[in-house]
Regions:
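Acidic, mature catalytic/reactive cores of soluble proteins
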Residues: 1-162, 169-208
Length: 208
């Protein structure tokens, strides 16, 4: 997922370097971009969506071959936002998002699925979260926004646009009925990390 973002940034900086007459640096970055594109178009493509990352032993995170963490939202969104993936693959990847990560009945747009429980190699700290909480198959708002932006870029906003409301915790099905005492637990991560330590509970926004 980060490679798409890096590629997008590098392309912009190549233009700046050329404008400044820094040809050597621009050419070095251009060569790096060529290598990244090749890897993304080949190794990163999983047949129906893009894989999120690779462990040191070459095992992929976000692959259809996995039983946990089979698909990840960020890789699909940035494949579109970077403009570097072929358009047909962009559409296929976002169709996979709709099929696997969007849940209209509960108003959630998951970061990944299925949750990570016993996956080896471990994905690190996100695997320590309970299933459905934060990055471990919960809804993570920045990735949700990127997905809506990607859908808009593909001119299918009518299909995905409603997810912009799903990405807003105020529009949770239970939001209208929540009591004042519940608010700290629903919004603690948007206030400060210290607040989380003071109120160590998960919020409704994560779908836990």
């Amino acid at each position: 997922g980060l490679a798409w973002f890096l590629l997008d940034i590098a392309v912009d900086w190549i233009a700046l370097a050329r404008a400044r007459g820094d040809t050597a640096r621009a050419e070095r970055w251009q060569a790096a971009c060529t290598g990244w594109r090749t890897a993304l178009h080949n190794e990163a493509w999983d047949g129906g969506w893009y894989q999120r990352a690779f462990f040191d032993d070459g095992t992929a995170l976000g692959s259809h071959a996995r039983t946990e963490g089979r698909i990840d939202l960020i890789a699909q969104a940035w494949a579109v936002l970077s403009g570097a993936a072929p358009v047909e693959r962009q559409r296929t990847a976002m169709q996979a998002v709709q099929a696997h990560l969007v849940h209209d009945d509960s108003g959630l747009l998951q970061l990944l699925t299925p949750p990570l429980r016993h996956a080896e190699p471990s994905a690190g700290y996100i695997q320590a979260y309970p299933p459905g909480v934060r990055e471990n198959a919960g809804q993570y708002s920045h990735a949700g926004v990127w997905a809506v932006m990607a859908a808009a870029a593909l001119a299918v906003h009518d299909q995905y646009g409603e997810n912009s409301s799903e990405n807003n915790p105020e529009n949770s099905p239970k939001a209208a009925h929540v009591s004042a005492v519940d608010l700290p637990y629903r919004y603690f991560t948007y206030l400060s990390p210290a607040h989380r330590a003071q109120h160590p509970r998960w919020g409704l926004v994560y779908g836990a």
